[in-house]
């Protein structure tokens, strides 16, 4: 599949992989400008099921891993540094299992190698809503996304949360076939044992107030990876890379500098 991508900057390449429903432009708000100034070539792309391919369905984790590998090869990025979040982190982990020669190092934010009981129940609820065909009012959809995305500190800061309320209300998530299929791009079994064979240097970042993929699940991934490190950032929810971009960017750039 010909996925839309953006390629800018010069230097060692960094491939950014977005989470469920996130377009490549997600990274252009806080990450791409900083990383290009730091001397990196930044490549972002729309995952299958997003943007021009939102009507796609029936694809699997293996399909999306293949998409990512094909883009790396098409742009001659290998071995590439990867920065990923949520579903994107899971794709990156499975890429490192299947095609380790393509990856130089990886930053895995808000990730997991298995689902605990709570996250499995959340997944069942999301799936039930998607299959019901019910369309939530934009304001209620925004409420849920705010609670899932940010820390209490941000939610209780009138100034910080104002723009997010407006943005989430104005741009509700569309229940497209692609978005529904993204629900299946997740561990269907415990994958931690498979990650014990991945020797690629990896930094796992957990966001302390993340209720979608809480930090203890990310710490498990870091512990499974032979060359894994773990960092937990306080006062951040699932979108911590947007909530505290300076802290996150500094941690990633320092990790890259340590793994030249």
Outline where the language-model segments fall:
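Gly/Ala-rich beta-loop-alpha elbow adjacent to hydrolase catalytic centers
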Residues: 84, 88, 92
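Acidic catalytic loop of the alpha/beta-hydrolase fold
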Residues: 209-213
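Conserved HGGG/HGGXW glycine-rich cap/lid loop of the alpha/beta-hydrolase fold
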Residues: 1-54
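Short beta-strand/loop motif that positions the catalytic acidic residue
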Residues: 198, 204-206
């Amino acid at each position: 599949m010909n996925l839309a991508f953006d390629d800018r900057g010069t230097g060692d390449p960094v491939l950014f992989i977005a989470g469920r429903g996130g377009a490549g432009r997600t990274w252009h708000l806080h990450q791409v400008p900083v990383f290009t100034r730091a001397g990196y070539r930044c490549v972002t792309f729309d995952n299958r099921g997003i943007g021009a391919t939102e009507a796609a369905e029936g694809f699997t984790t293996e399909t999306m891993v293949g998409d990512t590998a094909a883009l790396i090869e098409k742009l001659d990025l290998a071995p590439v540094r990867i920065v990923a979040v949520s579903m994107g982190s899971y794709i990156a982990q499975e890429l490192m299992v299947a095609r380790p020669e393509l990856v130089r190092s990886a930053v895995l934010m808000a990730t997991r190698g298995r689902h605990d009981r709570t996250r499995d129940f959340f997944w069942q609820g999301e799936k039930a809503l998607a299959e019901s065909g019910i369309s939530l009012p934009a304001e209620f959809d925004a409420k849920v996304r705010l609670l899932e995305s940010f820390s209490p500190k941000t939610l209780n800061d009138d100034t910080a949360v104002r723009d997010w309320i407006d943005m989430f209300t104005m741009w509700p998530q569309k229940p497209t076939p692609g978005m529904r299929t993204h629900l299946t791009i997740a561990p269907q079994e415990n994958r931690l044992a498979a990650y014990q064979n991945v020797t690629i240097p990896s930094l796992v970042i957990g966001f302390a107030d993340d209720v979608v993929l809480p930090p203890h699940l990310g710490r498990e991934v870091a512990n499974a990876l032979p060359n894994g490190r773990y960092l937990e950032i306080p006062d951040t929810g699932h979108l911590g890379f947007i909530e505290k971009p300076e802290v996150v960017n500094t941690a990633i750039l320092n990790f890259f500098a340590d793994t030249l």
